[in-house]
Amino acid sequence: MIAHASTQNGLRRAQMPQPEYRALAARLVGRGFAVLVPERPGHGATGGKYLEDQGGCDEADYARSGRVTADEISAAAGHLRKQSFIRPDGIVVVGHSAGAWGALALASEDPRNVAAIIAFAPGRGGHANDLPNRICAADTLVAAAAEFGSGARVKVTWLVAENDSYFSPAFSRGMADAFRSTGGKADFRVLPAYGREGHWLAETEGGVNLAGPELDGALKSRSARPANKR
């Protein structure tokens, strides 16, 4: 299941097209996965209340925001798991940006429900005031990553492009270290620079190809887990 990026800007959220991640979905389908890309509440055609609001810089609550996103991902995964063509213990969550932040919060899920998590540039509050390399309440974000690591049971493959101006490799490594410091398991990888802005790598064919070896490694690691007997 692919969990999309988000924005605090209400107008941009309302105008958001249905997330597709075509190249990423195609790669997953080519490796035997069924793929679901649900649009979460408060975005585009789904509409409704924006439940994962993080608040302003002064009162940013990234932990709460991530957990709400995780709940939304979990609800969609629960629907997917009920389908007859799905291996219920083999679900992989691939998150991007805010969706990846929610996936980190989901790492405390039972591994029998979520087999692996792949997180492209997880975080929230990047590009504060629309300025590159500025993060709203950065210390709060790192502290929330540490909070997610406590009790985490699912391994995370954490990917960030060299030229990501939302969550730079140096800052992302600090978050990954915080996540691991409290017990979380994360394989942190820096991908080569891609295009003008590496944060959107997961949305393009070239970017997905660039991340291909890391993606395949994470998927093979999941596939190596023994299936539950039925």
Regions found by a protein language model. Name each.
Residues 3-4, 38-40, 120, 191:
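Alpha/beta-hydrolase
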Residues 116, 122-182, 187:
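The feature captures the conserved acid-bearing segment of alpha/beta-hydrolase catalytic domains
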Residues 55-84:
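Alpha/beta-hydrolase active-site loop
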Residues 75-140, 147:
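Primarily recognizes the serine-hydrolase "nucleophile elbow" in alpha/beta-hydrolase
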Residues 39-58:
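Glycine-rich "HGGG/HGxG" loop immediately N-terminal to the catalytic nucleophile
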Residues 6-45, 168:
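Short substrate-entry loop that stabilizes the transition state in hydrolases
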Residues 1-5, 160:
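The conserved beta1-alpha1 loop
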Residues 182-230:
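C-terminal catalytic histidine-bearing segment of alpha/beta-hydrolase fold enzymes
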